[in-house]
Amino acid sequence: MQTRFVSPVNHDEEQDEPSVRPGLLADFIGQDSIKDALTVAITSARKRNKPLDHILFSGPPGLGKTTLAHIIAQEMNSHIETTSGPVLDRPGDLAALLTPLKDRDFLFIDEIHRLSPVIEEILYPAMEDYTIDLLIGEGPSARTIQLPLERFTLIGATTRLGLLGSPFRDRFGIILRLDLYDPSELTVIVTRSAGILGIPITPEGAAEIAGRSRGTPRIANRLLKRAYDYAIVRGTGSIDQNIANTALFALGVDQKGLDILDRRILEVIANDFDGGPVGLKTISISVGEEPRTIEDVYEPYLIRIGFLKRTPQGRMITSAARDHLGNSHTRDLTSFL
């Protein structure tokens, strides 16, 4: 199984690395409009001695939704419990998380779009009235009890905002979408992370990594570590532009941040379907990847850089994508892999 170095999805081994996550809004790089909105909301809540309104973050994976949730709790001097939508199977699981929360604490639910309808319905009164209704027992003897909750704030994160029902979505007072980062912002992030991790890097080396990180800090930090491995084994231990370029080439990451899986999608559309339009399910079968993964993980960046178009008839590649696929360096990279 091939490792995808430019996947925005978190790798398990990355949990064990020293944290490069910022702890305060002032240290969070990029997403300026979101930081401004959160600064106003947090300052207002503090002055009013009230909990924050419930918050919903949306956007592609790897952009900092989880980091922002922890920063918000830190800025409010409050505790945060974290979980994810697929984990919350039973009402009792949710109650076990909500009942210990103290006034102005936080519950963060990642992949909140994957909550079951039953859990969503239990959250309605929890979000509005700070109570939850639980069914105790079975059959004729079953009864409903109401448990009071402290004033808490729910923070949800989703990559698929459209999958949340309107009644649930409307209960969030603050809804914010994170967008992909500019290369200049990612260069600052790479430089900052290198400093925290003790990795020697030049400004040109940081910019080279940033330019291939698909607008995603998680990918930038991952490529930084892999480039450092290469610098230690094949270089002098420091990452300059040449080392970064050579290391990323060896990892199969081209100048635009595309890997073999991205190029496979583009090549299937270009060569097998004459540039499109072609349906998502057909692409999925051709490249051997789930439709949802293609739509959530691959397509946002390909669309962002102008290589892919979504039309009512299906997906189409652009002339820019054809030019990129025809680039000699890209052809060499495909052969290398």
Swiss-Prot record:
EC numbers for this chain: 3.6.4.-
Superkingdom field: Archaea
Head domain (RuvB-H): annotated span: 255-337
Disordered as annotated region, ranges: 1-20
User: Where does the record place the region Small ATPAse domain (RuvB-S)?
Assistant: 182-252
Write down the chemical reaction(s) this protein catalyses: ATP + H2O = ADP + phosphate + H(+)
Q: Which Pfam families match?
A: AAA_lid_4 (PF17864), RuvB_C (PF05491), RuvB_N (PF05496)
**Residues noted as binding ATP in the record, renumbered to the chain:** R21, G62, K65, T66, T67, E128, D129, Y130, R171, Y181, R218
Which CDD domains does this entry report, sorted A to Z? AAA
What one GO molecular function would you report for this record? ATP hydrolysis activity
Listed A to Z, the keywords are: ATP-binding, Cytoplasm, DNA damage, DNA recombination, DNA repair, DNA-binding, Hydrolase, Nucleotide-binding
Q: Which family does it belong to?
A: Belongs to the RuvB family.
Its quaternary structure? Homohexamer. Forms an RuvA(8)-RuvB(12)-Holliday junction (HJ) complex. HJ DNA is sandwiched between 2 RuvA tetramers; dsDNA enters through RuvA and exits via RuvB. An RuvB hexamer assembles on each DNA strand where it exits the tetramer. Each RuvB hexamer is contacted by two RuvA subunits (via domain III) on 2 adjacent RuvB subunits; this complex drives branch migration. In the full resolvosome a probable DNA-RuvA(4)-RuvB(12)-RuvC(2) complex forms which resolves the HJ.
Q: What is known of its domains?
A: Has 3 domains, the large (RuvB-L) and small ATPase (RuvB-S) domains and the C-terminal head (RuvB-H) domain. The head domain binds DNA, while the ATPase domains jointly bind ATP, ADP or are empty depending on the state of the subunit in the translocation cycle. During a single DNA translocation step the structure of each domain remains the same, but their relative positions change.
Indicate what this protein is called per its UniProt record. Answer: Holliday junction branch migration complex subunit RuvB
What species is given as this protein's source? Methanospirillum hungatei JF-1 (strain ATCC 27890 / DSM 864 / NBRC 100397 / JF-1)
Task: Point out the gene that encodes the protein.
Answer: ruvB
